[in-house]
Amino acid sequence: KDYGHLLKDDARYAARAERVSSLARDVSELLPDLVPALRGRLNKPAGPVAYHPPCTLQHGQKLRGGVEAHLAELGIELRLPQEAHLCCGSAGAYSVLNPGIAGTLRERKLGHLQEKSPVDGTRPARIVSANIGCITHLQAGTETPVTHWIELVDELLQK
């Protein structure tokens, strides 16, 4: 999405980059159009689902709240953790270059993601996110399955 901005002064690529930027979409931006077609076609998940909104989505692309709202519209009991706005420690190459700090951030994030519900005392059966770096980083610290939210939707879709 940033190619247009990054290459705006490049005489050869500025127009092409702007075109690519205008076409680029995160898969979550398709959800508003898909919810009506998916409503009523999903099985219920095995249990509550915790959602980790990745930095790439909420800070990089400034896309906040959409995934959560639309998954809830589809009947998925979604839990947002405390400190949802904070990084899980993956941060691209950060987890490789600074594994100690990245591990500390991961443990803090997983602690919040896996908290028991104050209502019924259950823990999430699954964690979903929207960034492969976050997904692999979080999965390395827990036995709870961690996947992309679209994988969850695909699995729940009555085929």
Label each region the model flagged.
Residues K1-K159:
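Iron-sulfur cluster-binding electron-transfer modules in prokaryotic oxidoreductases
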